[in-house]
Amino acid sequence: NNIAAALTASANPTFEVTIAGGRIRQEGRDVLGQQVEQFFSAYKVDFGLFGVGGVDADGSLLDFTEDEIRARETISQNCRTKVVVLDHTKFGRAAYVRGGHISDPDLVFCDGEPPEEIGAMIRDAGHELVTAGDDSAALALLPEFAEAGE
């Protein structure tokens, strides 16, 4: 539901990108609203990628609006592999609406190591944490993406 991500993905000639209609949140260029929930409910996809506004010390995934949470929950319910992509500034960042836990996504991609407690929550759930610079691990986890990029 992010316009920038859709444009980046569309640069790969082997990808077909379909985007949802709805209201654009200017700050993150996310498309939000009931149309987004209806759109994602109509699909069952291999990978659901999403970001978060923040991650609390207890592992709660946080965002700034209920619309963002509902979009993320709908994407999560309609994909086989849940992938959260975030940067280190999200850890401890205050946001107001809780929706999910850091141990929920199957894969967590981050630009660096998360706080030790957060990393333990991910690993204890049996899920993968991939940090920047760990390209071989990322490609091994997502072979479909590796093949598409060749």
How should each PLM-predicted stretch be described?
Residues 4-150:
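Conserved phosphate- and dinucleotide-binding cores of soluble alpha/beta proteins
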Residues 1:
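Active-site-adjacent alpha/beta core region of enzyme catalytic domains
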